[in-house]
Amino acid sequence: MDAFDVIKMPIISEKTMKLIEEENKLVFYIDKKATKTDVKNAVKELFDVEVKDLNTLITPKGKKKAYIKLKDEYDAGEVAANLGIY
């Protein structure tokens, strides 16, 4: 899967802003067929950061979310600023 096909769009809300600031996490809507390995590789390719932990879930509306915790040497705030969401 192509990295742009895996990651659909960032989720921007008060909750995700808190996660960026306090837990060094980013939250994205991802393709429903994407695996955790696909998501890790896409994040590494698109944002040049290493993933420490990754959790996925499918919402009741049928969309798949990924909560991506970055390694300590990377800052989620900088990645979010480059995306224009922070």
Curated annotation (Swiss-Prot):
Coiled coil: none annotated. InterPro entries: Nucleotide-bd_a/b_plait_sf, Ribosomal_uL23, Ribosomal_uL23-like, Ribosomal_uL23/eL15/eS24_sf, Ribosomal_uL23_CS. It holds the Pfam family Ribosomal_L23. It comes from the Archaea. One of its GO terms (biological process) is translation. HAMAP family: Ribosomal_uL23_A (MF_01369_A), Ribosomal_uL23_B (MF_01369_B). Belongs to the universal ribosomal protein uL23 family. This is Large ribosomal subunit protein uL23. It comes from Methanococcus aeolicus (strain ATCC BAA-1280 / DSM 17508 / OCM 812 / Nankai-3).
